[in-house]
């Protein structure tokens, strides 16, 4: 079906599931990733593809806190609505990061406001960030501006997740 790759970048452990071409489901790889070393980690982030497919459900079903990421478009808002329905169905505490934000209309932000969803951060559209990402560079290591944005975001996420999971206890 595929395989798992593991590595370390500075003090961050990274695990990636690689699905073989032609396979219909990545769920077995997700299960292997989650079963392996992840329980030993203090903080773990599981990145999922957009949408509400089985791999997304498998990834969130045992999560303590879910971070939904949406772009400021009708498609982004539609995808956000689908994933929002999933986290509600699973009863998961959650917050939203709005990505690639510009001034003006933001259907994803409107969806959050209408549904009382906590917006953790609005990351602005930025050509420099796109350049760094497309060149495989880690933005927080290359730019003090992005280090500040994402360090602040991590602090908010940890605080929010600890608060929400304490309420659920």
Per-region residue spans from a language model:
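Switch II (G3) loop of P-loop NTPases
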Residues: 16-25, 32-56
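Short, glycine/acidic-enriched loop or turn micro-motifs at the edges of active sites
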Residues: 50, 74, 102
């Amino acid at each position: 079906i595929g395989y798992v790759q593991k590595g370390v970048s500075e003090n961050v452990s990274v695990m990636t599931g690689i699905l073989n071409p032609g396979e219909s489901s990545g769920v077995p790889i997700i299960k292997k990733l989650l079963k392996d070393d992840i329980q030993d980690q203090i903080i773990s982030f599981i990145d999922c593809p957009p949408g509400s497919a089985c791999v997304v459900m498998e990834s969130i079903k045992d999560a303590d806190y879910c971070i939904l990421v949406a772009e400021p478009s009708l498609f982004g808002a539609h995808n956000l609505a689908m994933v929002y329905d999933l986290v509600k169905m699973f009863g998961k505490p959650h917050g939203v990061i709005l990505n690639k934000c510009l001034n003006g209309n933001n259907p994803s932000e409107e969806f959050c406001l209408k549904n009382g969803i906590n917006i953790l951060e609005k990351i602005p559209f930025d050509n420099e960030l796109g350049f760094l990402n497309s060149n495989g560079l880690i933005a927080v290591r290359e730019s003090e501006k992005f280090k500040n944005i994402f360090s602040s975001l991590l602090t908010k996420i940890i605080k929010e997740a600890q608060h929400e999971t304490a309420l659920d206890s």
